[in-house]
Amino acid sequence: MLDSIKIRLQYLLPKQGLTRLAGWGADKQAGWLTQLVIKAFARYYKVNMQEAQDPEFSAYRTFNEFFVRPLRAGARPVVAEENLLAQPADGAISQLGTIHDGQILQAKGHDYSVEALLAGNYMLAAEFQNGQFVTTYLAPRDYHRVHMPCDGVLREMIYVPGDLFSVNPLTAANVPNLFARNERVICIFDTTFGPMAQILVGATIVGSIETVWAGTITPPREGVIRRWTYPQAGAEGAITLEKGQEMGRFKLGSTVINLFAEGKVYLAPQLNSGSVTRMGEVLAEAVPVTPPC
């Protein structure tokens, strides 16, 4: 009964308004009030401040500064072997596995299409047909910067407006097409083992999604799909990111989805739904093909 009420509220609440309000408040320098909120949040969610570059609450002028706090050097060693992909974020794996007939598993009994996730781009979706996917959920207590699983050259970025449903196991099991409905930023990279998608999915009170090459992507929320393309590897202005390098961040929230082409990676066998992830640990083993182009 309680779960039914929570899901019903997801449809009734003014999610856009709540998100704007949360984003506004999280970016304000409110002195003692900001410190009170940060300390209460850290205690409630058991945030490990000893991993932070600056463990003192007083170092953070706004809640957003605290939320996207960098980690101290060496806190997340990145797997060194060239053929191994690294976890992109701290969190927990929601689902992972093979993309069957263009469908991704959201939760037991719920699938959604890769084409819908990729904003209806059927040509892009075809690149990941029968490939592999990994969905990583970032809890409030987690480190909220997102990193590269491997070296890659940025091919394109797509901003997709959408709903702002909360993302958690309850909504994943009860809101159809959750990740294909929510606001998201799709980043497509060319790698030595083929294309890779890294998708940052928004949620209720996720005030901002940012990338290191373009800054804040949302807000503003203009309600239209936006697309950016970038030079190929070796061309002037090409954007190349290395394994373990930061590529984006959430203020606040949410979820990272990775897509890989068929036969190009083998997901680490120890991973399953519910596995806790730490950025830099092994995600998969790559099967090299050709240099990115």
UniProtKB/Swiss-Prot annotation:
Family statement drawn from the similarity comment of this UniProt entry: Belongs to the phosphatidylserine decarboxylase family. PSD-B subfamily. Prokaryotic type I sub-subfamily.
Keywords noted in UniProt: Cell membrane, Decarboxylase, Lipid biosynthesis, Lipid metabolism, Lyase, Membrane, Phospholipid biosynthesis, Phospholipid metabolism, Pyruvate, Zymogen
Xref: Pfam families: PS_Dcarbxylase
Subunit structure, as described in the record: Heterodimer of a large membrane-associated beta subunit and a small pyruvoyl-containing alpha subunit.
A GO cellular component annotation in the UniProt record: plasma membrane
Pathway: Phospholipid metabolism; phosphatidylethanolamine biosynthesis; phosphatidylethanolamine from CDP-diacylglycerol: step 2/2
Species for this entry: Yersinia enterocolitica serotype O:8 / biotype 1B (strain NCTC 13174 / 8081)
EC number from the UniProt entry: 4.1.1.65
Cleavage (non-hydrolytic) (site feature) positions: 253-254
UniProt PTM comment: Is synthesized initially as an inactive proenzyme. Formation of the active enzyme involves a self-maturation process in which the active site pyruvoyl group is generated from an internal serine residue via an autocatalytic post-translational modification. Two non-identical subunits are generated from the proenzyme in this reaction, and the pyruvate is formed at the N-terminus of the alpha chain, which is derived from the carboxyl end of the proenzyme.
Name listed for the protein in its UniProt record: Phosphatidylserine decarboxylase proenzyme
InterPro entries registered for this protein in UniProt: PS_Dcarbxylase, PSD-B, PSD_type1_pro
Cofactors: pyruvate
Recorded name of the encoding gene: psd
Transmembrane segments: none
Cofactor note: Binds 1 pyruvoyl group covalently per subunit.
UniProt function note: Catalyzes the formation of phosphatidylethanolamine (PtdEtn) from phosphatidylserine (PtdSer).
